[in-house]
Structures are given as C-alpha cells and as structure tokens.
Amino acid sequence: MSDMYCGIGKIPKGKERGTPEYCVQSNQVRYYGLKKIDRSLLETAKVKKTSLVKEQTKLNNLIEKGKQMLKEYNNLKLIINDEKSSKSAVNKARKRMEEIVLRKDRFVKDVKKQREIVNDLIEKEKEEEKAAKKAEKAEEKKKQSKNSTSKSGSKSSKSSSGSSKSSSKSSKSSKSSSGSSKSSSKSSKNSKKSSKKSNFRTQFGGKPTGQIW
C-alpha cells in the first residue's frame, strides 16, 4: 500500500497509481482531484473512523521490524560464537542481544494487538458489505412489489370496464325482449277481435245492419 502514488505527475519508478479509496483515506486527492470522486467516498473520509489501510500498513511495518530484529539477533549470535571475535565485540553483542530479547516480549504483544485490530476491521467491512447487499435486495423486492401491484390494479380496472359493458349489453337485450313481448301481446289481441267478428258473421249471415266491420 505504501507504494501507491496519488500525485498528478508521472508515477515514480517502483510505485503504482493509488486507488481512489487509498488516496481519500490518506488525504491525498491531488490526482483524483482532476476527476469526479464518488460522493460516498468523500462522506466516508469525513467520518472519523479507523482506516483498514492505515492499520494494515502499521501491521506490515511491525512485521518488517520483527524480521529485521530477528536478522540482527542471528548476526549477533554469529559474532558471539565466532572464535575470532574480540572480547569487547562479544560483550557488545551480548548486551545488544539482551536488549532485543527484552524488546521481543513487548513487540510480540504489539503485533498480536495490531493483528486483532486489522481482523476486526476486515470482519466489520464484510458485515457492512453484506448489509449493503441485503438492503439492495430489499429495495429491488420493494420495486418489484410496487410494479406488480400497479399491473394488478390496471387489470382489475379493465375487467371492471368489461363487466360494465357486458351489463349494458344485457340491459339492452332485456329491453328488446320486452318490446318483442308487447308486440306479441298486441298481435294476440287483434287475432281475438278478428275471430269474434268472423263468428258473428257466420252466426247471423253477413254484416249486421248499420254496422261496418
């Protein structure tokens, strides 16, 4: 991470272009100041919270320091075990070894503590990612539910309109049937009158005097 470069100039040899996240967390937005940075990143930078990048860098530095201490310790052992080494050199090496041994216990505690901090931050980031994905899925389901309700309402409206039209047609058909029934009733009455006239003529032999049928 320390090899990342956030400047606007040419990237130095042995370094690489820093990511937006790294540059924002490091308060170095010289390069990304030329471009539009995601607003959420800037909001995150404003919040005072422990940065995983910084804590990981601290852990890496401690591990590197431990490697150097181990290397120095092994070199001091070589000096002490070498028969050609002078007495003063051996005494000096032993004194330095004692200092390293004393520092070792504290150093191991520091590394352990820093590793726990980094692991906690990693777990926290994973939980935040899961929560964000869960929120996205919930939002998608909410949108789908709204669309489904809207379509269902539209279909119901069309069905109601169709039912109304069908009812109107049924009403017209009923009126037509009523008209036909009335016409049939009139025809029946006329037929009865005609039958009476015919019977009267048959019984009295023609038209009665003074009446026109």
Curated annotation (Swiss-Prot):
Biased composition (Basic and acidic residues): 122-142
Stretches for region Disordered: 122-213
Alphabetized UniProt keyword annotations: Coiled coil
Entry's transmembrane regions: none
Composition skew (Basic residues), residue ranges: 189-199
Low complexity bias (residue ranges): 146-188
Coiled-coil segments on the chain, per record: 54-78, 108-151
Similarity remark: Belongs to the mimivirus R546 family.
Record-given protein name: Uncharacterized protein R546
Organism of derivation: Acanthamoeba polyphaga mimivirus
